[in-house]
């Protein structure tokens, strides 16, 4: 399976990466907030759903503080995933405080052949060194601040080390894909770098992603092979 992913999706297999597992979303959020506050260069966040409420406000407060000291912050979210969670002026509000913000596949009522092509990723990258991913979005219900569907149970992981490079690439590919001006981004490479880190854990890590912008079914094939 790992060879298939590397061959078809070009996501390499890494070592030299420490992994922290969160059995509850709120534990992931708490650690995420701590790491966001330490950012020195850039923060990339890509999520299916963002809710302009308590959980996000904790994150936004830190993002605004990091922007003030020169950290580059980019937010990317799926429009349909965030319907009912945020207002239409969300992008403008983020830009006003220095946070770059883009939307994937804005919802337009009527016939739309790509209506179901959604971005379900949940990714945070901090300085290209630390990354978070998992099953939780940035909405109150995922952290049990609210309970519209009962007690929510989800998981997440924190990566530190070489494998974070794949999360960085995954974010930038989607970020650049929705804007013509970034189709050939000359600065893409400056976010992909090696740094002096010695992991305490051993093993292999292979972050990978399927894209809503093509007809490839790599994610499906991986799960079928596992089953």
Give residue spans per PLM region:
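Charged, low-complexity intrinsically disordered terminal segments
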Residues: 1-227
